């Protein structure tokens, strides 16, 4: 009972009383407390006490058992026996029983690899820092208490599940969360996916210790529930597609993707809290679609944990040190060891090699070598030199199973899948015993590989042994399709698959495979891989889609210099993101052999920021120098794009020295969200290049002195920059004067993007220059620039006098109808030259549509109008449609996204399709259009007089009937393109 009171149980039950019952409770407390032989509490305090205050008073004045007995007595008198029964179960039973069950389940968990050394991490004592870390995840900001939605983001297998298990143990064993959550339920998406359909009640019952869970009681306090959704990427589907199918009934069976989507989208139990783990790729897809309260990045085991694991396993201190040193010297293996189960695998493999008297250095040559050595060791008995025929068949069956899983996005396998791939029922206990397979749930015959990367290496081995045409599943595709899917990151779950294929082609790996399986391997696969690279070489669009780091790791694992040089010189365009030390080393290994590069795009995030230890920084800078040497050895680099990169002074110096005398071929330079520790004039020296035509510095902070340096370059006679993008660069109103002079003096600048800078008063000086006859600017973006009502007169004057400006974007400013009226006076003039106007998020209403309609009837040059995210409504759009049908209107593209339209306006919209001969695109996303309205639109789109063929609609936003109708209309009308983004 002590723990229950410490959990504020009394307060919870007092909150269950309505106002009348609560008053009666207080009166009984005043009348009967002396009869019970207890000390009287001040009536003044009791009378004014809230439920929380009264709970505190009772806990303060009475011992726990008497206080609880008294509470039961008063509940009886006010006829709330239901609370008594529930409270007794709570004190003696349900949450306590559940916590005890979960503790037993986790500490004796055979459902995953926790039976190995992972148990050591679960058994580590919790420190105060651990508790603080866990508690901070669910700390509400400010005084408002609201449901928490927390993301754990980290690579596959990096230890997210381990952290979730430790968090649950912390909740079970300590008071860290007991006051916050009555129940924590853990759902692994890869397991849930196997169910196909389920209700939330059924998922909860699966975790319950008894035959049936008290669902009604559990769900009665949703704010006391935490749902852990682990490995969200395991659902392998878009959980945001089923808007119309979301459900709030916890007992109703749903497809599991709809069920999880209902939880994530807060349709079901919105008062509950969520803790979601996902890979960075999955998180990136969702971060703008879920309102989360906290994100924690999981980077895996720290060096001390890895070292400790080796010492625990080896016991012999010297051997442990030898093995750990080998791993520490190999950055790729060390990165692998940050994943708990792989740390155990690496240490086990090295231990076995050392105990057999073999040289462990050879298997640390690359990651592939260590994986294959570990796997082959599992199948070869301790004193044998080669595997039995049965072992060969078992591994071959596993490789076939793994390949099927990679192509079908399956990581949990039933017995039928095992049999289909040649694994007999009698093989399963052996594969479980050696640790190749793991039974994820004792009550169900479902299995996973030790780790997804083990499945990947087995799948790679399949391709070295057989052709895809020999596989029992037609889902398994050719090596060419595999490599393109891997390099283009079509399947985000494929982390090592392609690089293992390359790694297995190394001579030493070929010998190991031939020795294990007893036959020579075909060399055809190497030729096929080179053909893939040649295909990429001749296709610029394909090169844009290739993930450079994936390609680099493939070539690094192969460790074949001849093939590396040939492969790198197939590439004219490379795009890579280096997220850690290992990535930089691998990228350097490849790029120093690239002689044909024309376009380079990279991000090094904070890897080169100088935060590392001195010894690491030296090695990093050497590798960074190899990367930057590509500017010297590739003689024709035309585009350089840097993004999300923080360079220390030393790192910038390396870039500068390699680029300074070899930047003359650059015509595009992009530095987005880049931070340099250097003398800024050095960077601006790099853009003094007469061939440079496009410069984009968005999200890179520019001081006033930086702006002056930039404008000095722009003012030089030899400057040929045509497009300048300085969006979100912290440019101020004072900086506008500097830019204003450039608009007059520069004879090449045609595009200027100043979006998301606070220009305010500075717009006056810009507009003055824009009115100057020497200004040749054609394209101006001032979106989200904090423009106010005084700015519209200045811009109106520009629209009257400037004869070159064809595009103006002033979206996300408080234009309002009054400001729009000022601009429209200029736009209705017969000599207006503006062709494109963007007014998204400008607080325009129906009234403003009257002025826009006047422009459309009089301005024959305007071909694009974007008025999305304004409250135009059906009435306002009718005004626009009537104007679009006017013979003087030549509009081609109209944006009406999120304009609060309904199906009632579809007749008006449809009439523009058939009567306007120029309108080819209309964006209608995020409007409440209905089935009948869409039928009208689609009927118009089929008419011969219709010029429109691009329609912005999110098909999945509609109900099932409407979705089917739109899909059918697209099939009937081959010219029609319905797009979910415009």
From Swiss-Prot:
<feature type="repeat" description="LRR 2">
    <location>
        <begin position="634"/>
        <end position="658"/>
    </location>
</feature>
<dbReference type="InterPro" id="IPR041267">
    <property type="entry name" value="NLRP_HD2"/>
</dbReference>
<dbReference type="Pfam" id="PF05729">
    <property type="entry name" value="NACHT"/>
</dbReference>
<dbReference type="InterPro" id="IPR001611">
    <property type="entry name" value="Leu-rich_rpt"/>
</dbReference>
<dbReference type="InterPro" id="IPR011029">
    <property type="entry name" value="DEATH-like_dom_sf"/>
</dbReference>
<feature type="repeat" description="LRR 6">
    <location>
        <begin position="802"/>
        <end position="825"/>
    </location>
</feature>
<keyword id="KW-0395">Inflammatory response</keyword>
<dbReference type="GO" id="GO:0005524">
    <property type="term" value="F:ATP binding"/>
</dbReference>
<feature type="repeat" description="LRR 5">
    <location>
        <begin position="777"/>
        <end position="801"/>
    </location>
</feature>
<protein>
    <recommendedName>
        <fullName>NACHT, LRR and PYD domains-containing protein 4A</fullName>
    </recommendedName>
</protein>
<keyword id="KW-0067">ATP-binding</keyword>
<dbReference type="Pfam" id="PF17776">
    <property type="entry name" value="NLRC4_HD2"/>
</dbReference>
<dbReference type="GO" id="GO:0006954">
    <property type="term" value="P:inflammatory response"/>
</dbReference>
<dbReference type="InterPro" id="IPR041075">
    <property type="entry name" value="NOD1/2_WH"/>
</dbReference>
<feature type="repeat" description="LRR 3">
    <location>
        <begin position="689"/>
        <end position="712"/>
    </location>
</feature>
<dbReference type="InterPro" id="IPR027417">
    <property type="entry name" value="P-loop_NTPase"/>
</dbReference>
<dbReference type="InterPro" id="IPR007111">
    <property type="entry name" value="NACHT_NTPase"/>
</dbReference>
<feature type="repeat" description="LRR 1">
    <location>
        <begin position="594"/>
        <end position="618"/>
    </location>
</feature>
<feature type="repeat" description="LRR 4">
    <location>
        <begin position="746"/>
        <end position="773"/>
    </location>
</feature>
<feature type="binding site">
    <location>
        <begin position="154"/>
        <end position="161"/>
    </location>
    <ligand>
        <name>ATP</name>
    </ligand>
</feature>
<keyword id="KW-0433">Leucine-rich repeat</keyword>
<dbReference type="InterPro" id="IPR050637">
    <property type="entry name" value="NLRP_innate_immun_reg"/>
</dbReference>
<feature type="repeat" description="LRR 7">
    <location>
        <begin position="827"/>
        <end position="847"/>
    </location>
</feature>
<keyword id="KW-0547">Nucleotide-binding</keyword>
<feature type="repeat" description="LRR 10">
    <location>
        <begin position="916"/>
        <end position="943"/>
    </location>
</feature>
<feature type="domain" description="NACHT">
    <location>
        <begin position="148"/>
        <end position="471"/>
    </location>
</feature>
<dbReference type="Pfam" id="PF02758">
    <property type="entry name" value="PYRIN"/>
</dbReference>
<comment type="function">
    <text>May be involved in inflammation and recognition of cytosolic pathogen-associated molecular patterns (PAMPs) not intercepted by membrane-bound receptors.</text>
</comment>
<dbReference type="InterPro" id="IPR032675">
    <property type="entry name" value="LRR_dom_sf"/>
</dbReference>
<feature type="domain" description="Pyrin">
    <location>
        <begin position="1"/>
        <end position="93"/>
    </location>
</feature>
<feature type="repeat" description="LRR 9">
    <location>
        <begin position="888"/>
        <end position="911"/>
    </location>
</feature>
<comment type="similarity">
    <text>Belongs to the NLRP family.</text>
</comment>
<dbReference type="Pfam" id="PF17779">
    <property type="entry name" value="NOD2_WH"/>
</dbReference>
<dbReference type="Pfam" id="PF13516">
    <property type="entry name" value="LRR_6"/>
</dbReference>
<dbReference type="InterPro" id="IPR004020">
    <property type="entry name" value="DAPIN"/>
</dbReference>
<keyword id="KW-0677">Repeat</keyword>
<feature type="repeat" description="LRR 8">
    <location>
        <begin position="859"/>
        <end position="882"/>
    </location>
</feature>
